From Swiss-Prot:
PROSITE patterns in the record: ODR_DC_2_1, ODR_DC_2_2
InterPro entries linked to this entry: Ala_racemase/Decarboxylase_C, Arg_decarb_HB, Arg_decarbox_C, Arg_decrbxlase, De-COase2_CS, De-COase2_N, De-COase2_pyr-phos_BS, Orn/DAP/Arg_de-COase
Gene name of the encoded protein: speA
NCBIfam families: PRK05354.1 (NF003763), speA (TIGR01273)
Catalyzed reaction equations: L-arginine + H(+) = agmatine + CO2
Keywords: Decarboxylase, Lyase, Magnesium, Metal-binding, Polyamine biosynthesis, Pyridoxal phosphate, Spermidine biosynthesis
Listed name of the protein: Biosynthetic arginine decarboxylase
HAMAP family (UniProt xref): SpeA
SUPFAM superfamilies: Alanine racemase C-terminal domain-like (SSF50621), PLP-binding barrel (SSF51419)
Necessary cofactors: Mg(2+); pyridoxal 5'-phosphate
UniProt similarity note: Belongs to the Orn/Lys/Arg decarboxylase class-II family. SpeA subfamily.
Role this protein plays: Catalyzes the biosynthesis of agmatine from arginine.
Source species, domain of life: Bacteria
Length: 648
């Protein structure tokens, strides 16, 4: 891993500076780095394995007609994350002498893509790793893919009679589905289904903890949380199960404190409360034996190791240690056998393995070129020219007076407004208005280039930089590929994957392809904080400028939508080979235009026929030549088969 170090010589820029700037040595763990050529590399097997240069990989994928935007899925990273998770719990179990083991499950909702779930099931078989389902459709996936009789199928979510009956029948297939009671009325459904089929499911109860959480998913716990039983409801459920002769099937307690726990103290409090509930259920006669601590094992998106929304103040080993130690302490005090531990750590497992790569289509910036002065310019334009001259003089002073900069900027804004008012009233023409805008931006650029590093800089002057930034047009839809950036303001690491031996010379943000003002990436990680501009390079003519969004393997693909009918991108599953090279295990083609049209109930053949009929009519009227009509139809036919994104 490249370590952060400032450049040693004045004006010299190195890959170490880029590594520090984008935080790669903080959030990249053992997987992502920068080589001496300034290109991002991925080491899917961690520090012990070989690395791949992403730009080289992209060039070879282009040779296979697989162009950006692309999702690169590194299945070796999935395997490495599974190994790390089990190793952490094994270490904790050995350290504390915990007399049971850990056996996790993957929540299908994190990434429901078939190849992803299949890969996790295959890799996880050595640990009897199972799946968690939160719906009837996800239950069917779990039943079909998990054929290990020792692996758990945790059945969460709302349940009707058919859901529960399916789990009972699946148990007779040799599977281990555990129906987790999350609503009080599910107790009656379980009893009814058991009586109907003459068999019972394995049963768990989700507790609604009183402990308060924090962050975006803080409402996952507490008295008003969506799922779980309150303490009175748990006691009532035990009574009903006892009366129905089903208490012996109650083997699991489950709780959940949010998708991303950023503060380990929240988990500790939840573990203490849940452990007490567990021993009480055992005391009431339930066999128990299993404690599911839910999801929440967090991902440090910015590498700051802080209790912020984009980070965590604990490591994986801290997490495993606290789970094991807290539960053991409580059970030991009450002389209850410690349970088998289960977690639903989907975000931790799947975030790192997927990288979204997109190309920049172009850029735009504010107009700062100054028009040649003419003799009959209006007063506001003359005043703006004079203000710009004053700014040049201020900036040539040995010590720049910020108050003078502020005064000049206030003048520039007033003169610009004068020009706009004159244009609205018809006193100046479009050319003079354009000149006024150019001069105003030239004033802004002059101020931004000479602002001293002073904490007392007025906010109005600090905001100038934001107005001068470049907009980089990205060949993606954030609503399809990064919906959490829009929906919950999630931060993901973004950076160029090449040219990192060069010092960035621009500040910018990204605008996507959608016709939506929310379609942008304008918030970026910044070592525990966030920034609204990203350091980027000037895009060179006739050269690709590739950007990578990292740590997006959980939820982004499955929650994306078809806004403006931009569909899924191509997804490539990549594995390292023993000779140090790589192979493409799976190529999952993204949506074509025909696919997304069909999703909205537009039949491609019908659309094509309507265009053909319109062309024929135009031919009859003499407004369209036959060869041009054929060319149009061929264009449409080809376009229907192609990606919804722009072609390189």
């Amino acid at each position: 891993m490249t370590k952060s170090k400032p450049a040693t010589k004045k004006n010299e820029w190195t890959v170490k500076d880029s590594c520090s700037l984008y935080g790669l040595d903080l959030w990249g763990e053992e997987y992502f780095s920068i080589n001496d050529s300034g290109n991002v590399t991925v080491s899917p097997q961690g520090k012990e394995g070989n690395s791949l240069e992403l730009t080289h990989l992209l060039e070879e994928l282009k040779g296979r007609n697989l162009n950006t935007p692309l999702l690169l899925r590194f299945d070796d990273i999935l395997e490495d994350r599974l190994k790390k998770l089990h190793q952490a719990f094994e270490n904790a179990i050995n350290q504390y002498g915990y007399n049971n083991d850990y056996q996790g499950v993957f929540p299908i909702k994190c990434n429901q893509q078939r190849h992803v779930v299949e890969e996790i099931v295959t890799i996880g078989r050595k640990w009897h790793f199972g799946l968690e389902a939160g719906s009837k459709a996800e239950l069917l996936i779990a039943l079909a893919l998990v054929n290990d009789p020792k692996a758990f199928l945790i059945c969460n979510g709302y349940k009707d009679n058919r859901y529960i009956e399916t789990t009972i029948l699946a148990r007779q297939l040799g599977r281990q589905p555990i129906v987790v009671i999350e609503q009080s009325d599910e107790v009656g459904r379980i009893i009814k289904a058991s009586q109907k089929l003459g068999a019972a499911p394995l049963i768990g109860i989700r507790a609604k903890l009183s402990n308060q959480s924090s962050g975006r998913w803080g409402n996952s716990v507490g008295e008003k949380s969506k799922f779980g039983l309150s303490i009175p409801e748990i006691l009532k459920a035990v009574q009903e199960l006892t009366a129905a002769g089903l208490l012996n099937e109650l083997i699991l307690l489950h709780f959940h404190v949010g998708s991303q726990i950023n503060d380990i103290a929240i988990l500790k409090n939840a573990l203490q409360e849940a452990s007490q509930i567990y021993v009480e259920l055992n005391r009431l006669g339930a066999p128990m034996g299993h404690l599911d601590v839910g999801g929440g094992l967090g991902v440090d998106y910015d590498g700051s190791r802080t209790a912020t929304s984009a980070s965590t103040n604990y490591s994986l080993q801290n997490y495993a240690n606290d789970v094991v130690a807290t539960i053991q302490e409580c059970c030991k005090a009450k002389k209850v056998k410690v349970p088998k531990l289960i977690s639903e750590s989907g975000r931790f497992l799947s975030s790192h393995f997927s990288i979204l790569i997109f190309n920049v289509l172009g850029t735009s910036s504010v107009p700062t070129q100054i028009a040649i002065e003419t003799s009959n310019e209006c007063l506001s334009v003359k005043n703006l020219r004079e203000t710009l001259m004053i700014l040049h003089q201020i900036c040539e002073e040995k010590k720049i007076d910020v108050s003078k900069l502020q005064e000049a900027w206030n003048d520039a804004l007033k003169f610009k407004e004068d020009a706009l008012n004159a244009f609205r009233l018809g006193f100046i023409d479009l050319t003079e208005r354009a000149t006024a805008e150019q001069l105003t931006w030239a004033c802004a650029k002059q101020i931004a280039a000479h602002l001293p590093n002073d904490l007392k800089i007025p906010k109005e002057l600090l905001a100038i930089n934001k107005g001068l930034t470049e907009t980089y047009y990205a060949n993606i839809s954030i609503f399809r590929s990064a919906p959490d950036t829009w929906a919950i303001q999630q931060l993901f690491p973004l950076l160029p994957i090449h040219r990192l031996q060069e010092k960035p010379d621009q500040l910018g943000h990204f605008a996507d392809l959608t016709c939506d003002s929310d379609g942008k990436l304008a918030r970026f990680i910044n070592n525990g904080q966030e920034k609204f501009l990203l350091e980027l390079h000037t895009v060179k003519a006739n050269e690709n400028y590739w950007i990578g969004m990292f740590l997006g393997g959980a939820y982004q693909e499955v929650m994306g939508n078809l806004h403006n009918l931009f569909g899924s991108t191509n997804a490539i599953h990549i594995r390292l080979t023993k000779n140090g090279k790589y192979k493409l295990d799976h190529v999952v083609r993204g949506n074509s235009k025909s696919d997304v049209l069909q999703a909205m109930e537009h039949d491609s053949e019908q659309l094509l026929e309507r265009i053909r009929m319109a062309s024929e009519s135009a031919i009859q009227q003499g407004s369209l030549k036959i060869n041009d009509a054929q060319r149009l139809i061929e264009h449409v036919e080809t376009s229907l088969r192609q990606s919804t994104y722009l072609q390189e």
